[in-house]
Every structure is written in C-alpha cells, then in structure tokens.
C-alpha cells in the first residue's frame, strides 16, 4: 500500500463497495462525490458505450463533475470487485486549503486548464 493510500485511508473518509460490473454512476447524472480507488479497477465509459480508460488502485475519478457541479460526461463501472473512498466536495476543498502553498498553486493551475 502506498503512503498516499495509507494517508487517505486514515483520513476518515467513508468507504463504499461495488461488485464487478456494477455501475458507479452514469453519463448525465448529477455528481455526488469524487472517488478514490482503494482496491479494484474502474472502467470509464463514453456516451457511446466505449471503454475509454481503466483506472486502478490509487487513482481518483469523478472529481471534475463533483467540484464544478457538472453532470457526468462519462459513466463509471466497476471492472472488478472494487472498494472506493468517497470524497465530498467540502472535504476536498478543505484539504486543498490546508495543503502546502506550492501544491495549492499546482492544483489551481491544473484546475484552470
């Protein structure tokens, strides 16, 4: 387990599990959370039902829709039995505000692109 995963796991975030082939969210749904993959794999699926990417342990997804209150432009499905950590918008922004100043600058720059 990576140091990042250990830190995130110990942060008190709620965990949620999905069985293989379960939909996490569908295109055009309103976002509820950003998700951190604790174990398993998640497929990102286009509007045309093409798998455009597979995310693995330690990766984050759903953050853009969640942070900017935009409907999901893709769907997310558990490719394997998967455990996710739920990251609420207020928790994410709180972590950004308490981050190192250089990291905050990087996050702000990336969010503008």
Predicted regions: what is each one?
Residues 25, 52-53:
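A sequence-level detector of short linear motifs
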Residues 1-45:
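Regulatory nucleotide-sensing modules
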Residues 108-113:
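Polybasic "coupling" helices that flank or enter modular domains
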Residues 54-107:
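Cyclic-nucleotide recognition modules
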């Amino acid at each position: 387990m990576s140091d990042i995963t250990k830190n995130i796991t110990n942060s008190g975030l709620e965990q949620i599990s999905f069985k293989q082939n379960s939909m996490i969210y569908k295109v055009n749904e309103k976002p509820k959370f950003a998700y951190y993959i604790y174990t398993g794999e998640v497929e990102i699926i286009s509007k045309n039902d093409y798998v455009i990417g597979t995310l693995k342990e330690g990766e984050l997804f759903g953050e853009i829709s969640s942070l900017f209150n935009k409907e999901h432009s893709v769907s997310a499905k558990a490719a394997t039995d998967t455990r996710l950590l739920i990251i609420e918008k207020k928790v994410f922004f709180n972590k950004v505000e308490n981050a190192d100043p250089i990291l905050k600058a990087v996050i702000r720059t990336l969010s503008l692109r």
